[in-house]
């Protein structure tokens, strides 16, 4: 089997909280790739059902009956400690626990899964979607993250890419990607704001674009605000209304909650286009008096009232972003709306009130981020020329110094990549070591900021307090991921770390997860192969029985008996749930005997041609196409020119090569 050439394309993936999307550059244009289910976006949902792992639409379809094993909105947990996500935990039906180092883990059937592993399953789906379209393996990607993701969340997203078998060439913020998609063909200089309200996060970025240069001036946001929160206010309202009507609390019923979640999302979407919507959930629960039905009417005005606090929370980040960019609202030429929640009329009114202008609705809020990621992939791959992206870090980075103070080395909204150095010293006489505690945030005291890493610089030569010269260097790469080093000038001793963050995965954990992903890939392949073999065997039995029924009067009785025996043999291996090879062998043996029908029929036709009376006596007039239908083989013989069989074999071979090919 020849080894398939890997694609030179760097795909762009928008790994969203609610939905994900994949795009690729083709002929100088970014193209969104349609999934195997025929959709341009895929639900970011992973479910475990028996021995199967379901991703996307199949996972979403069974969520109501399998809520505790269906993992949705897991992006809200990636790169975070369990203690940081208490509000999010209350909104999901699956079990969220604290791992050995305080990380978030999900518990399903007694097994722990990290957010990175679940994200990797969605990324694998995106990767396979691109591979099916391009017809060759894909190994490189640009993945987007919310602009206000901190260092550990970015690093964890990159780790998810590695687990999925992707070399993540760049992590870029979602608003920046949207700006790339918007401005790639625009002439002249513009200052734009990107208002990105997605399923789990809110970002606002201010950019200056012109002559192919995309410079981020500032960014702000709220990683605890998104469409899920808008769903939640509707869910709470439905629970309260139902309790008033029936005296039953649905908040403890996971299956009912999943139905309410689906109903809330549907109502929210409908209210962007209509002024009121009916919510009907028959048989939502039951008590001693019988089944209970939930029937409510929600108006747009009441929904906006329920969500007023959430809408208000989008304003302050916008004002801060403008202030950091040293601009006023009147300086902004255009406001882009990104994320599904930006379709809500009340959100658009908030944007209009902040910036004093109608927002631009010319981009598809669900696809624009993936398109921008593909453009960045094109820039990195040399396919897109004369584009320069200057991004910034969203939060200040520094270290803890004497008195528990946060001393920033890199201020927020600093353009990246960048390197900053600063000299520090010891706090005590003859201090032999220092602990470098790396922080991210805007608060003056260390304890109020997020600790994203720590390491020790040891064997400092004895010296009075304040004498040792310890140079701390912060090096931030284009992905916004931090590398820190500390060097003692006297001894030349140096210590370096890549900030994996206190809630980042260690290298051995990543390797284990990569291996697990490969193992599941193999298991899924075997399950699919078994399913295909059983389906083919069933189909073969049907064809064989139909052929006997149609032609038994025109073929030898001994052949009929042989075929019936082979049919029974195939039935037996199916009933016994025999291994795939046994099923295939039995099917192929039946197929070989079915081909004898064709031979017998051709012989019969030859005899009929010799005597014109044969047709008058009712002998069938058989054509070649009829024979082909009934002599179908699970594997076409060498040299078979039937295009359908030939194509099927080529497809199957390509699939095997893609699945088996080791990740680079």
Swiss-Prot record:
Residues 600-617, 638-649 have a biased composition (Low complexity). Residues 578-592 have a biased composition (Basic and acidic residues). Induction: By stress conditions e.g. heat shock. It holds the Pfam family HSP70. The keyword Iron-sulfur does not apply. Keywords: ATP-binding, Chaperone, Nucleotide-binding, Phosphoprotein, Stress response. The modification Phosphothreonine is found at residue 201. GO terms for molecular function: ATP binding; ATP-dependent protein folding chaperone; unfolded protein binding. PROSITE patterns: HSP70_1 (PS00297), HSP70_2 (PS00329), HSP70_3 (PS01036). Residues 516-538, 578-664 are annotated as: Disordered. CDD domains: ASKHA_NBD_HSP70_DnaK-like. PANTHER family: HEAT SHOCK PROTEIN 70KDA. Acts as a chaperone. Belongs to the heat shock protein 70 family. This is Chaperone protein DnaK. The lineage of its organism: Bacteria, Pseudomonadati, Chlamydiota, Chlamydiia, Chlamydiales.
């Amino acid at each position: 089997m020849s080894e398939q050439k890997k694609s030179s394309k760097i795909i762009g993936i928008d790994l969203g909280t609610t939905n994900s999307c994949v795009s690729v550059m083709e002929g100088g244009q970014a193209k969104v790739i349609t999934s195997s289910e025929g959709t341009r976006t895929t639900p970011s949902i992973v479910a475990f059902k028996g021995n199967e792992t379901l991703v996307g639409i199949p996972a979403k379809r069974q969520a109501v009956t399998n809520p505790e094993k269906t993992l949705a909105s897991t992006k809200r947990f990636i790169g975070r400690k369990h203690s940081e996500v208490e509000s999010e935990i209350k909104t999901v039906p699956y079990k969220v626990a604290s791992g050995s180092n305080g990380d978030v883990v999900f518990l399903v059937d007694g097994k722990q899964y990290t957010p990175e592993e679940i994200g990797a399953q969605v990324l694998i789906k995106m990767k396979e979607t691109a591979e099916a379209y391009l017809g060759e393996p894909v190994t490189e990607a640009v993945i987007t993250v919310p602009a206000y993701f901190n260092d550990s969340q970015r690093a964890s997203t990159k780790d998810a890419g590695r687990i999925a078998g992707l070399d993540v060439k760049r992590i870029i913020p979602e608003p920046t990607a949207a700006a790339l998609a918007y401005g790639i063909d625009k002439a002249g200089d513009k200052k734009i704001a990107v208002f990105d309200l997605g399923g789990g996060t809110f970002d606002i970025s201010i950019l200056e674009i012109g002559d192919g240069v995309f410079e981020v001036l500032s960014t702000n946001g709220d990683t605890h605000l998104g469409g899920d929160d808008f769903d939640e206010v509707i869910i709470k309202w439905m629970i309260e209304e139902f309790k008033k009507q029936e005296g039953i609390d649905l908040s403890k019923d996971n299956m009912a909650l999943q139905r309410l979640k689906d109903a809330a999302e549907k109502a929210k979407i409908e209210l962007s286009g209509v002024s009121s919507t009916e919510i009907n959930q028959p048989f939502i629960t039951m008590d001693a008096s019988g089944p209970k039905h939930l029937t409510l009417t929600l108006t747009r005005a009441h929904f906006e009232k329920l969500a007023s606090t959430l809408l208000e929370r989008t304003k302050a980040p916008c004002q801060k972003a403008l202030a950091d960019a040293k601009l006023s609202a009147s300086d902004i030429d255009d406001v882009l709306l990104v994320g599904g929640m930006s379709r809500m009329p009340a959100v658009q009114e908030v944007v209009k009130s902040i910036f004093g202008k109608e927002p631009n609705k010319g981009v598809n809020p669900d696809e624009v981020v993936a398109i921008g990621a593909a453009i960045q992939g094109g820039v990195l791959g040399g396919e897109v020329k004369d584009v320069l992206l200057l991004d910034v870090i969203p939060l200040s980075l520094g270290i803890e110094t004497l008195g528990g103070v946060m001393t920033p080395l890199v201020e927020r909204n600093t353009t990246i990549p960048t390197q900053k150095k600063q000299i520090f010293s010891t706090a005590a006489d003859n201090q032999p070591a220092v602990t470098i505690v790396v922080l991210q945030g805007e608060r003056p005291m260390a304890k109020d900021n997020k600790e994203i890493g720590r390491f020790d610089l040891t064997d400092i030569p004895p010296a009075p307090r304040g004498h040792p010269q310890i140079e701390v260097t912060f090096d931030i790469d284009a992905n916004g991921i931090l590398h820190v080093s500390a060097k003692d000038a006297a001894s030349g001793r140096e210590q370096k770390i890549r900030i994996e963050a206190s809630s980042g995965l260690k290298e051995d954990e990543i390797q284990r997860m990569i291996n697990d992903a490969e193992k599941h890939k193999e298991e899924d392949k075997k399950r699919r192969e078994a399913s295909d073999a059983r389906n083919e065997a069933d189909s073969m039995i049907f064809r064989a029985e139909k052929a006997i029924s149609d032609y038994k009067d025109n073929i030898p009785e001994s052949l009929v008996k042989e075929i019936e025996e082979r049919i029974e043999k195939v039935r037996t291996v199916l009933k016994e749930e025999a291994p795939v090879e046994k099923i295939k062998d039995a099917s192929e043996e039946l197929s070989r005997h079915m081909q004898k029908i064709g031979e017998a029929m051709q012989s019969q036709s030859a005899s009929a041609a010799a005597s014109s009376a044969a047709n008058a006596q009712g002998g069938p007039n058989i054509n070649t196409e009829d024979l082909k239908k009934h002599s179908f083989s699970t594997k076409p013989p060498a040299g078979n020119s039937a295009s359908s069989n030939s194509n099927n074999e080529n497809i199957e071979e390509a699939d095997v090569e893609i699945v088996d090919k080791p990740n680079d």
